[in-house]
Amino acid sequence: MENLNMDLLYMAAAVMMGLAAIGAAIGIGILGGKFLEGAARQPDLIPLLRTQFFVVMGLVDAIPMIAVGLGLYVMFAVAK
C-alpha cells in the first residue's frame, strides 16, 4: 500500500507539471496570435503592444515554473 501512495504522488506531480506546460503553451500561442493581429491592425502601436506582450508572456510562463516547483516539492518532500 505504501508503494501505491508513492506512485500516486509521482503521477499527480507529473500530471500537474504536464498540464501546466500544455496550458502555458496554448496561452502563449493565443497571446502571440493576438499580438500579431493587433500589430497588423495598428502598426503605430507596435512598441506599446510589444511591451505588454512580453509582460503578459512572462506572467503566463511563470505558471509552469510554479507548477514545476510544486511538483518537485511533492515528489521529494511530501513523498518521504
Curated annotation (Swiss-Prot):
UniProt site (Reversibly protonated during proton transport): 61
Membrane topology, as annotated: Multi-pass membrane protein
Annotated InterPro entries: ATP_synth_csu_bac/chlpt (IPR005953), ATP_synth_F0_csu (IPR000454), ATP_synth_F0_csu_DDCD_BS (IPR020537), ATP_synth_F0_csu_sf (IPR038662), ATPase_proteolipid_c-like_dom (IPR002379), F/V-ATP_Csub_sf (IPR035921)
GO-annotated molecular function: lipid binding; proton-transporting ATP synthase activity, rotational mechanism
Cellular compartment(s): Cell inner membrane
Listed transmembrane segments: 11-31, 53-73
UniProt GO cellular component terms: plasma membrane; proton-transporting ATP synthase complex; proton-transporting two-sector ATPase complex, proton-transporting domain
Signal sequence bounds: none
Pfam families attached to this UniProt entry: ATP-synt_C
Xref: Gene3D superfamilies: F1F0 ATP synthase subunit C
UniProt KW Cell cycle keyword: no
UniProt key word Cell inner membrane: yes
Key words, A-Z: ATP synthesis, Cell inner membrane, Cell membrane, CF(0), Hydrogen ion transport, Ion transport, Lipid-binding, Membrane, Transmembrane, Transmembrane helix, Transport
HAMAP family named in the record: ATP_synth_c_bact (MF_01396)
Subunit structure: F-type ATPases have 2 components, F(1) - the catalytic core - and F(0) - the membrane proton channel. F(1) has five subunits: alpha(3), beta(3), gamma(1), delta(1), epsilon(1). F(0) has three main subunits: a(1), b(2) and c(10-14). The alpha and beta chains form an alternating ring which encloses part of the gamma chain. F(1) is attached to F(0) by a central stalk formed by the gamma and epsilon chains, while a peripheral stalk is formed by the delta and b chains.
Role summary: F(1)F(0) ATP synthase produces ATP from ADP in the presence of a proton or sodium gradient. F-type ATPases consist of two structural domains, F(1) containing the extramembraneous catalytic core and F(0) containing the membrane proton channel, linked together by a central stalk and a peripheral stalk. During catalysis, ATP synthesis in the catalytic domain of F(1) is coupled via a rotary mechanism of the central stalk subunits to proton translocation. Key component of the F(0) channel; it plays a direct role in translocation across the membrane. A homomeric c-ring of between 10-14 subunits forms the central stalk rotor element with the F(1) delta and epsilon subunits.
Family affiliation: Belongs to the ATPase C chain family.
Official protein name in the record: ATP synthase subunit c
Organism in which the protein naturally occurs: Erwinia tasmaniensis (strain DSM 17950 / CFBP 7177 / CIP 109463 / NCPPB 4357 / Et1/99)
